[in-house]
């Protein structure tokens, strides 16, 4: 009889662990690996003295998928004028990185993460981000 209780207890513990693994927060899979202020950015065209490119306000981050699952990521970077520069949803495999930037950044950024092909989690659209987080 005691052996039966042990097996039931073991089964319940394994079921709980398996259920917990299913509810993993994929936001924990994305880690900032680097950030840079004032580094050249080919996509930023801000000039001073009418002709010199000025990168002094650029803020760039590198984000890496540290999990073994493929994830989809949506990133937004805040510009000094209070708007958010959004980036298309990007799929990242294990150990893959992505770069995001703000040409006149504040240092604030946001990201949303889900497992690839997860239809239950909806990532926000650019319009939702621009409307919801305006001047925050």
Positions of predicted regions on the chain:
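Bacterial N-terminal signal peptides that target proteins for export
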Residues: 1-7
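Low-complexity, acidic Ser/Thr/Pro/Gly-rich terminal tails and inter-domain linkers that flank the onset
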Residues: 23-54
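Short, hydrophobic/aromatic beta-strand segments
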Residues: 70-76
